[in-house]
Design a protein with these regions (language model features):
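Short, glycine/charged-enriched secondary-structure capping and boundary segments
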Residues: 18-22, 44-47, 70-73, 125-126, ...
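Active-site neighborhood of phospho(di)ester-bond hydrolases with catalytic His/Asp-centered motifs
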Residues: 6-7, 29-34, 55-60, 112, ...
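N-terminal active-site segment of His-dependent metallophosphoesterases
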Residues: 1-54, 72, 218-220
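Anionic-ligand binding region
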Residues: 128-167, 171-176
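Beta-strand-turn-beta hairpins that frame and shape the catalytic cleft
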Residues: 1-4, 105-111, 169-174
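Active-site neighborhood of divalent metal-dependent phosphoester bond hydrolases
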Residues: 45, 51-112, 118-139
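Acidic, His/Gly-rich catalytic cores of divalent-metal-dependent hydrolytic chemistry
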Residues: 155-236
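Active-site environment of divalent metal-dependent phosphoester hydrolases
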Residues: 10-15, 37-40, 61-66, 119, ...
Length: 236
């Protein structure tokens, strides 16, 4: 089974549509949270994911739509964007986010936004030592995660920055982050996603160019913080 792994779309419809257009043949699309926040098209992104039957878990920005008190943990521009998002979400979109689980499974593997540690949504996986502690508890399976906006693979041998376009063999125990569709932070502004072949035990990472200027124009028209527009072109 081949699974498309998308994460951190962040209301960026142009980036999502570019990814979906470039997507190779897969059996399932899995979204690893943070569907909304930062960007200008939360309802459009949700509608698109619903239309393709994508499976998704909840991220911290999605959680903030349901639990506004969590905004105290956000930086000022992220909180401002989240408040704007909450105001423009339709009742149908809000129900969709409320129905998302905090964690899920893809075959025998795990799918979360932050980490496989409860409550699954908030923890960042950033270094080898932290990843190794998680891998010991995870056992012989993979965990797909997002949250950091950085395409990465963590194994018992350490952190790997994956090459683009190559099929990479992955050991039985691994943490796999496809990077961010809507707000990459690795210095490359192109949308990032991955495809996992569960039978071949391999993962392929992809980057896709999209119309950043259109997204930036929408951000400015909506009155969202300027940093959300500027950072898209920088990939930061």
């Amino acid at each position: 089974m081949r699974v498309a792994l998308l994460s951190d779309i962040h209301s960026n419809l142009e980036a999502l549509d570019a990814v979906l257009e470039a997507l190779p043949q897969v059996d399932r699309v899995v979204v690893l949270g943070d569907i909304v926040g930062y960007g200008p098209d939360p309802n459009g992104v949700i509608a698109r994911l619903r239309s393709i039957g994508a499976r998704a878990v909840r991220g911290n920005h999605d959680q903030a739509m349901l639990e506004p008190s969590t905004l105290e943990w956000f930086n000022p521009h992220a909180a401002a964007s989240a408040r704007w998002t909450r105001e423009v979400l339709t009742p149908q979109s809000l129900r969709y986010l409320a129905g998302l689980p905090s964690h899920g499974r893809v075959g025998r593997h795990r799918a979360v936004h932050g980490s496989p540690n409860k409550p699954y949504i908030w923890e960042y996986i950033l270094d080898d030592l932290q990843a190794l502690e998680i891998l010991v508890k995870l056992g012989r399976r993979w965990c797909f995660f997002g949250h950091t906006h950085l395409p990465r693979i963590f194994t018992e041998e350490g952190e790997q920055i994956p090459a683009i376009g190559d099929w990479l063999s992955v050991p039985p125990s691994a943490l796999i982050n496809p990077g961010s569709v809507g707000q990459p932070r690795d210095g490359n502004p192109q949308a990032s996603y991955a495809v996992a072949d569960l039978d071949a035990e391999a993962v392929q990472f992809h980057r896709v160019a999209y119309d950043i200027e259109s997204t930036q124009a929408k951000i400015r028209e909506a009155g969202l913080p300027e940093i959300e527009a500027v950072r898209l072109a920088q990939g930061r």
